[in-house]
């Protein structure tokens, strides 16, 4: 059975944020725990886990690949496979390649054209390489995905008017507060999303930016870039009272802000409104916070309306990008099919060469001693004959194998026609048998 490419995943279209956080694999713990082992069934694996999607790429043999990935994924999160299954999509072969190229090109993102997904995919690939979980197929596929993403960004305008999740968060804040110059914002986390949010907040005219991060030095570095103030993480709840707008984007595995924490903050603020935007998955802020008076909590799924308004501007460019994706998907499919054909070509050439060498040895034995020049001439003649005899069948196989549906059938015919799978009968045995029949 031939190896195939499988993509198993869920995203912002198939699962809400509460489901995505239950099944998030932000630390690639599936690989670390070895619950998708590299063996005869699964030979390569890569995990992409972001706030909007979890996708597992696997190369393997047979339908057991999907069930094994689902079991491992659910087990890694301490969940039941049946709870995961309703939210999952599965792509195989050509469809898996197309989907990955769409993802890498940000055509499948909540924010079409956003640049973060490509960096996240590259990071996932780096981690898979570090754990020795990729081989020739995924290596080729991921490099091709990066190339496709580059083509889309350079040959279309799909990214020219793109917004980021951070931009959408700030736009939502502007709709609530209007003029921003009399309000203060706090960023919890100091990663790429926080940096983008700081950029958009500053552009919107925010009066002050605070940055709270577990690693104080990183928080101070980000605050310095935007003329803000860094806060020690242990002082978070004391300083929350200073902020009107809080945007949280940490990589915590559970909520870091709960309703009981905010009650005291509200008292110290004399119950002035607080606006929380949680763009982390898993979520940083307990949903119960939204039940408090004068507190307004939004999560990443609430940003879709802002994103949809921006989407209309990019639909035409996205259509051009999809044409590129289709073209490159076809090219990769041809390469993958050529990979399937290669063992048959190698076996055919090796069999022909073995027969030629056996015949040469038999001929030299009959001739007796010959000089080196004669021997070289005989070897050159046989080598030329092998190449010329194999040229037509190999060319025919390559041409027919490019036909997606017919390719495997022609491989099977060729292997049977040239007896390439008969391991028990040496290639010269048939010649000896035929010669024996002719002599009698």
UniProtKB/Swiss-Prot annotation:
Pfam families in the cross-refs: GlutR_dimer (PF00745), GlutR_N (PF05201), Shikimate_DH (PF01488)
Example of a GO biological process term: protoporphyrinogen IX biosynthetic process from glutamate
Binding site for NADP(+): 189-194
UniProt-annotated site: Important for activity, residues: 99
List of catalytic residues: 51
Residues that hold substrate according to the record: 50-53, 109, 114-116, 120
Keywords: NADP, Oxidoreductase, Porphyrin biosynthesis
Function per UniProt: Catalyzes the NADPH-dependent reduction of glutamyl-tRNA(Glu) to glutamate 1-semialdehyde (GSA).
Record remark on domains: Possesses an unusual extended V-shaped dimeric structure with each monomer consisting of three distinct domains arranged along a curved 'spinal' alpha-helix. The N-terminal catalytic domain specifically recognizes the glutamate moiety of the substrate. The second domain is the NADPH-binding domain, and the third C-terminal domain is responsible for dimerization.
Subunit structure as annotated in this protein's UniProt entry: Homodimer.
Note: During catalysis, the active site Cys acts as a nucleophile attacking the alpha-carbonyl group of tRNA-bound glutamate with the formation of a thioester intermediate between enzyme and glutamate, and the concomitant release of tRNA(Glu). The thioester intermediate is finally reduced by direct hydride transfer from NADPH, to form the product GSA.
Designated name of the protein: Glutamyl-tRNA reductase
Species name: Nitratidesulfovibrio vulgaris (strain DP4) (Desulfovibrio vulgaris)
């Amino acid at each position: 059975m031939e190896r195939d490419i499988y993509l198993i995943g869920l995203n912002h279209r198939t699962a809400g944020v509460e489901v995505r956080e239950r099944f998030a694999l932000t630390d690639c713990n599936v690989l670390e725990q070895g619950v998708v082992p590299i063996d005869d069934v699964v030979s390569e694996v890569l995990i992409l886990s972001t706030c909007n999607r979890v996708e597992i790429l696997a190369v393997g043999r047979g339908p057991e690949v999907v069930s094994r990935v689902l079991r491992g994924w659910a087990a890694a999160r301490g969940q039941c496979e049946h709870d995961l299954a309703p939210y999952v999509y599965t792509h195989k072969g050509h469809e898996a390649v197309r989907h990955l190229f769409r993802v890498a090109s940000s055509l499948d993102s909540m924010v079409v054209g956003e640049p973060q997904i490509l960096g996240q995919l590259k990071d996932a690939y780096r981690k898979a390489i570090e754990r020795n979980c990729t081989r020739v197929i995924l290596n080729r596929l991921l490099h091709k995905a990066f190339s496709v993403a580059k083509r889309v960004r350079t040959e279309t305008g799909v990214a020219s008017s793109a917004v980021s999740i951070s931009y959408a968060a700030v736009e939502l804040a502007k709709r609530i507060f209007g003029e921003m110059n009399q309000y203060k914002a706090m960023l919890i986390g100091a990663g790429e999303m926080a940096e983008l949010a700081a950029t958009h907040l500053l552009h919107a005219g925010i009066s002050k930016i605070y940055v709270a991060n577990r690693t104080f030095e990183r928080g101070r570095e980000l605050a310095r870039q935007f003329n803000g103030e860094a806060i020690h993480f242990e002082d978070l709840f004391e300083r929350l009272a200073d902020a009107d707008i809080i945007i949280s984007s940490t990589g915590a595995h559970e909520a870091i802000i709960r309703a009981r924490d905010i009650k005291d903050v509200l008292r110290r603020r004399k119950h002035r409104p607080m606006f929380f935007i949680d763009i982390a998955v898993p979520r940083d802020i307990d949903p119960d916070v939204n039940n408090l008076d004068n507190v307004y909590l939004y999560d990443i799924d609430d940003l879709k309306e802002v994103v949809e308004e921006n989407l209309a501007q990019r639909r035409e460019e996205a259509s051009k990008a999809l044409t590129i994706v289709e073209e490159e998907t076809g090219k990769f499919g041809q390469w993958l099919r050529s990979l399937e054909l290669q063992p048959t070509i190698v076996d055919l050439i090796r069999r022909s060469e073995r027969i030629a060498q056996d015949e040469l040895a038999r001929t030299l034995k009959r001739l007796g001693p010959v000089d080196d020049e004669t021997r070289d001439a005989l070897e050159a003649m046989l080598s030329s004959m092998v190449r010329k005899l194999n040229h037509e069948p190999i060319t025919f196989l390559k041409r027919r194998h490019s036909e997606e549906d017919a390719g495997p059938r022609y491989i099977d015919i060729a292997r049977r026609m040239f007896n390439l799978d008969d391991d028990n009968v040496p290639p010269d045995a048939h010649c000896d048998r035929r010669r024996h029949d002719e002599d009698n």
